[in-house]
């Protein structure tokens, strides 16, 4: 493995430790939660549509999501390893025979529909995904509880130190 591949693998592992993306391909309806910066505020915006392509490899891998917004087709390309992509949820698995669904650009209405994949592989992926999401939520909740307990203990220690200092000051004043 050359140096560039090694660096890419390290970066991919670093990002994968923070968040894991589900296994999805072209034809799947996905909801991408994107971090949007507006001035000094940041918020998370959901972008839901059909994944029409996955391209590239390694750190340069990206996927294209198409949705219809107010009657106008909108496509957005998301890098898989972008820090702005907070999470990706697979809403529905699609059954298609192509890797690139660019032909959907020319279609409207019923002809642009994608049949839902109800095969065993899709069901297994959906179940595994739901379980992974539940585990992730439980882990985050546990981290929040631990952080709250640590903060409460820190506050209690600070109050005790403050109380002891006040008592020492009062004892010193009484001694004079």
UniProtKB/Swiss-Prot annotation:
Q: Which organism is it from?
A: Sinorhizobium fredii (strain NBRC 101917 / NGR234)
Main function: This protein is located at the 30S-50S ribosomal subunit interface and may play a role in the structure and function of the aminoacyl-tRNA binding site.
Whichever gene encodes this chain, its name is rplS
Which Pfam families has this protein been placed in?
Ribosomal_L19
Q: Which GO terms describe its biological process?
A: translation
Q: Which UniProt keywords apply?
A: Ribonucleoprotein, Ribosomal protein
**HAMAP family under this entry?**
Ribosomal_bL19
InterPro entries listed in its UniProt record: Ribosomal_bL19, Ribosomal_bL19_CS, Ribosomal_bL19_sf, Translation_prot_SH3-like_sf
Q: Matching Gene3D superfamilies, A to Z? A: 2.30.30.790
Name the family: Belongs to the bacterial ribosomal protein bL19 family.
- Protein name per its UniProtKB record: Large ribosomal subunit protein bL19
- Listed GO MF terms: structural constituent of ribosome
Q: Which GO cellular component terms are attached?
A: cytosolic large ribosomal subunit
